[in-house]
Regions:
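Conserved AAA+ ATPase "sensor/coupling" helix adjacent to the nucleotide-binding pocket
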Residues: 158, 173-185
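Structural recognition of the conserved hydrophobic beta-strand(s) that form the central parallel beta-sheet
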Residues: 68-69, 103-105, 133-139
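Walker A/P-loop nucleotide-binding motif
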Residues: 28-51
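Short regulatory helix/loop adjacent to the ATP-binding pocket of P-loop NTPases
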Residues: 81-84, 142-157
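Short glycine-rich substrate-engagement loop in P-loop NTPases that contacts/grips substrate
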Residues: 58, 63-101
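Sensor-1/coupling segment of RecA-like P-loop NTPase cores
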Residues: 122-149
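Pre-Walker A (pre-P-loop) alpha-helix and adjacent loop at the N terminus of AAA/AAA+ ATPase modules
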Residues: 2-35
Length: 198
C-alpha cells in the first residue's frame, strides 16, 4: 500500500512530498491548494505520492470523494462514455465530475488526442471554478508538454513540484526501505550503483 509513511524522501523530492501531504491535509478546505502538478522522469515516485494522497483521504477523510486514474484509464473511460452517449444522450464521465478530488497520472499520454485534451480542459476548468481539487502527474513540466495553451495555463496556475533524480545516498535509503534491514548494508551497497532512475 502506498502511503506517506513508507515514501522515502530527501532533498530531491521533499517539495513534492510535503506538497502532496499538505494537499491531502487541506483537501476539505475550499479554495486552498486547488491544484498540484508533480513532474519528473519515470520511476522516481510520482505515482507513489498520488496514491498516497488517495489512500490518506480514504483512511482519514472517507467523506471526500476521490477519483484516481492513470491517463490510459481516462482515455478508455472517455471513449466508452462517448459511445454510450450516442445511444442514450446521457451526461458522461459522472465518475469524474461527481468527485471532490480528481487525481490523474501520466497526463503526457493524452498529448495529440484532441478530443481527450479538450475534454480534460473542460473537466479541470469545472473543478477549479467549483473549488474542487485536482492532482496531476507527468514526466515533464507543463511548459514542455506541448499541450493546448489553455490547459498549460491551468497546470501552471497551481503548485508545480519537480521530483529530481535521486542521489547515491537517496538510492541507498530507498534500497534500505525495501530490503531486509539485517541484510541492507551488504546488499544495498552492492546494488545501489545499478539503480539509476529507481
Amino acid at each position: 500500500k502506498f502511503t506517506f509513511e513508507n515514501f522515502v524522501f530527501g532533498p530531491e523530492n521533499s517539495l513534492a512530498y510535503r506538497s502532496a501531504l499538505k494537499f491531502a491535509m487541506l483537501a476539505d478546505t475550499p479554495g486552498t491548494c486547488t491544484s498540484l502538478f508533480i513532474y519528473g522522469k519515470s520511476g522516481l515516485g510520482k505515482t507513489h505520492l498520488l496514491l498516497a494522497i488517495k489512500n490518506e483521504l480514504a483512511e482519514k477523510s472517507p467523506e471526500i470523494k476521490v477519483k484516481y486514474a492513470n491517463s490510459q484509464a481516462y482515455l478508455d473511460d472517455l471513449m466508452t462514455e462517448f459511445d454510450r452517449q450516442k445511444k442514450s444522450n446521457a451526461p458522461i464521465m459522472q465518475a469524474y465530475h461527481g468527485v471532490d478530488v480528481l487525481i490523474i497520472d501520466d497526463i503526457q499520454n493524452i498529448i495529440g488526442k484532441r478530443a481527450s485534451v479538450d475534454y480534460f480542459f473542460q473537466l479541470m476548468d469545472e473543478f477549479i471554478r467549483n473549488n474542487k481539487k485536482v492532482v496531476i502527474a507527468a514526466d515533464r513540466a507543463p511548459k514542455d508538454l506541448n499541450m493546448d495553451e489553455r490547459l498549460t495555463s491551468r497546470f501552471n496556475a497551481g503548485l508545480l513540484c519537480l521530483v529530481a533524480e535521486p542521489s547515491y545516498e537517496m538510492k541507498y535509503k530507498i534500497l534500505q526501505r525495501y530490503y531486509d534491514p539485517r541484510q541492507a548494508t551488504t546488499r544495498c551497497w552492492r546494488h545501489t550503483g545499478a539503480t539509476a532512475g529507481i
